[in-house]
C-alpha cells in the first residue's frame, strides 16, 4: 500500500535539524522555507528544480525513484479537498504538472511519448503530506496496456473503466485536447461524478497522456484496502525506458540540465511524499 510504505520513511535528515521531523507539513516546509526564499534571495530554486512565481508553483524531485517529480503550489493548499482548487480563477496545477514532464524526460535522457507520462494526486486518506502535490512520472506498463486495450470504452463523460487497475475500480473519461490550458481536471471530477464535489477528500485523480489528448481516471477511497492512492498507477522505476536502451541517449541541449547560478543552499530534507 502506497501510504503505508511511504509513512515509514517520510523524511531523510541530511544537514540541518527541524522540529517534528516526520510531520505532515514537511513538504510545505520545503516549499515555504527553502525553495521559495532561496529563489528570492539567491536565484536558485534548490532543493527544488524550479520555482515559478508567476504561475505560483514549484517542481521538486522526490526521493522515491529516479524519475518522480512533485508539482506543488507556492501558496498553502492542503490537497484535493481544498475548495480553492475549484474556484473559477484557480491556478491550473494540472497544466503546470503536464509541462513538468520535461524533468522526467531529462532524467531518462530521451523524449517520451504522451502515453508514457502520468500525473496523479492521492486522496486525503491515501497521502501523508498536507500540501497539495501532483506526482509526475512514467505510467505503469500494465496500466498503459490496459488503457490501449480498452480505449473504445473510454468516452467524453465519466463511466466505469471496464477492468480494475492495480486491483481497484476507477471511473474514466477522455479529454480530446493536447493541454489543460482551458480546462481544470479537478472541476471535471467535481462536476462530472455525482456527489464528488462534496466528497473530494475521498477521491484520487490520475491523468495519463494519449496521442490525441488525455485519459482521466478517478478512484474513491473505500477503506483500509483502498485508500484512494492513484499514484499506484505510476511506475517510479520507469520501466518504459527499457525500450530506449538500444538507442543512443539524446544529447541535445533540450535534455541537458544546467547547473543553477549563484549560491547552492544546503539541502535539509528530501521527502517521500504521497
Residue ranges and their predicted role:
Residues 1-2:
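N-terminal secretory signal peptides that target proteins for export/translocation
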Residues 5-16:
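Bacterial N-terminal signal peptides
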Residues 21-274:
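HIT superfamily nucleotide-processing domains
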